[in-house]
Amino acid sequence: MRQIFPADPAGPEIGQAVPGETGAAVPPAVVALAGLYAYPAAGTRPEPWLRANMVASADGAASLAGRSGGLSGAADRLVFSVLRSLADVILVGASTARVERYRPVAGREIWAALRNGRAPTPPIAVVTRELGLDPDGPLLAGAPPEARTIVLTTAAAPAARRAAAARHAEVVVAGPDRLTPATIIGALAERGYRRLLTEGGPSLLTQFNEAGLLDDLCLTISPVLEGGWAGRIHAAPAAADQGGPAGPGAAAGPGTAARLRLAHVLEDDGSLLCRYLRGTS
């Protein structure tokens, strides 16, 4: 893996590493990536700071054979683990959690030395308007006590579902009948989470962007032409299960274009790993 923007002809290749292979030691590749992807220092950034991590094919598809994991390579997986290691909490929509078969973050998947005294692993926070989750599935029931899964839902969710989820997870009612980007972020901020990482899906990313709350986009462009019917990372319709501002079943309009500033580009085996910051300066 090498940095191609900003250009640094004298810079070394970043290399590769796999969590868990080197014990407590942090390989040079991870140190370099942690610096490139560091959250802005406290006092110099909006708080909380919302980062998204997404992957797309060269022709813009957000998934391959129905899952984003089909577009991921070794470099993307390494950055994925570093971003998770740096985050306070990982935010995901319920439909994405189901399709991608989310589980709690395992210690072997991240770099504990990057946690800086926080819980060994970041919790997963799931956004679900109607709480259509398996209360006894691994995502809720398998989380460790220090990083219990957080379920962000509404007062309109069936009481029996809320009670079932609360057996294992922290259930947070963050709205009467829908969840807005501001209430989602506010609920996490109230619990001390400042460095937020969302992994989508596209509907959730769209809502945060159109609310003006997305600060940072990490996008891997995979050297693949999908050529099918997969959607883009920034979706038009609002997913009903995620309680989007547009409401269940409503199609969004043309949306709000957000200007982004390119912070860096890494290249590895044809994959481009880009980081964009909101704004132009």
Give a label for each model feature.
Residues M1-S281:
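Enzymes that bind and transform nitrogen-containing heteroaromatic metabolites
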